[in-house]
Amino acid sequence: MTIEKKLEDLGLVLPDLKPPLGAYVPYLERDGLVFISGQGPVLAGGGAICGRLGDGLDIEDGARAAQLSALNILAQIRAAVGSDWQKLVRIVRLCGYVNATPDFTHHPAVVNGAS
């Protein structure tokens, strides 16, 4: 079963890639590794989830933002491997950043949205 089929079974779909908004490459392949540039919670129809957790955004908003970011990462991987998911052996590192107020303490629940 392909990654895209597994996502479809979960009601998820990889987004179409948009051109970068700046002077950077979305991914770089080097010595069998693919490095993905930072990906954010960009919505399929345009725009993005913006704001701070604990100040207008709740845990569910944050988890959805993490999920969207993860889908964007997978879309970049798909582009890097030419849709041949067999080339993907493992994801070595995933780093999540959470914009939150100082009193917000549920960072793991937010980043878990990328799982």
What is each PLM-predicted segment?
Residues 1-115:
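Short, polar/acidic, helix-capping and beta-turn segments at strand->helix junctions
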